[in-house]
Amino acid sequence: MAAITRKHILWSAAFGGLVFFSGVFAKQAAAPSPVEPNKEEVKAARSTVMMLKHLHYEHKKLNDALSSQILDRYLKDLDPTRAYFLASDIAEFEEYRYLLDDDLGRGDLTHGFAIYTRYQQRFNQRLDYVLKELKKGSKNFDFTADDSLEVKRENAPWAKEAQELDSLWYKRLKSAVLSLKLSGKKDEEIFKLLTKRYDTQRNNMNRNKADDVFQTFMNAFTETYDPHTEYFSPRTSENFNINMSLSLEGIGAVLQAEDDYTKIVRLVPAGPAEKSKQLKPNDRIVAVAQGDGEFVDVVGWRVDEVVDLIRGPKNSTVRLQVLPANAVDEHQTKVVSIVRQTIKLEEQAAQKRVMTITRQDKDYKIGVIKLPTFYADFAAMQAGDPNYRSTTRDVAN
């Protein structure tokens, strides 16, 4: 990617961010309601179009040819193995092939979101089918018969009927069951594990919000310029800035989803959570409160939404209702109160050490520089802070 100055440019506003990378930075569920774009995303679409038009090194015209590329990329991003959409869906989307350029220029996201809504519908149909087949147990799978499964399906024809996808997903499921059998797992464990896996996938899909859909659609657009130009949603933009600045304000805990819970994976060394000695890896967070406020139950929430509640201004207090890792039942919760502080992510910073290596009875000292990631504190840089951190400056020092 060649940006105007061959440096990466970050644009961030209330509705999100657009990033040009220079190459270095590189159960039967109820049908969810269709996700609709909001006013900020309409503004962001128009702004992104203008930025790419005037700031990108590749001065491409937003025309029918680009619109066609956007549709192809969007469908590929959503369904790369052609395992969800039907040929009838694709035929319907063909009506949008030369309209997306005009849509984006006006900030009209109707067609982009309509495609996603259909994708979500097809996704749920596939997962419902898989979960139904799993309920039939091991008797549903005959491993004595010859069978084949097409793995690379990027160029496979779109299925004409739902029955074709049923056959594909049955074979996929059969392959997954067989793989687990070969690993030594018993039938009961296999079907429990797979049911949990697919149920989690379905739940995660149905938790997607407008900014997730918008980010996917806009990146189908930005990628037509080059693969390193991306649109960031507000949350993604915030996380990007945190990672680049190597600091955040919070409690210093790395979280991940596990079933319907948010689990603590590890504690950041010297962070408030570790210093409190009240939290441990594998503890599960079930509710969050700000200061003396009411607890908000977060079971079933997305991890990023839980993180939003836990992060906050330095010296403010957050209370967590936690289910300890060693709890024998789900009623043994405890309340943990932690004062937020600025967390330095030093493990991601440039590191140096001197190694002594012996060769032919002679010792040699070798200097080693380790770069876990590339970073730069843009906020401090733009504010004129002479001591702002970046990969280049830390290595030089």
Tell me what each language-model feature is.
Residues 157, 166-226, 230, 237:
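AAA+ P-loop NTPase catalytic core
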Residues 12-20:
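Bacterial N-terminal signal peptides
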Residues 2, 27-37, 53-63, 203-210, ...:
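Cleft-lining beta-strand/loop regions that shape enzyme active-site pockets
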Residues 62-68, 72-148, 202-257, 317-319, ...:
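Extended, small/polar residue-biased N-terminal targeting/export presequences
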Residues 2-11:
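Bacterial N-terminal signal peptides that target proteins for export
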Residues 76-77, 98, 112, 117-128, ...:
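PDZ/PDZ-like domain segments forming the peptide/carboxylate-binding groove
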Residues 42-46, 50, 64, 68-76, ...:
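Solvent-exposed, polar/charged alpha-helical surfaces in well-ordered, non-transmembrane soluble domains
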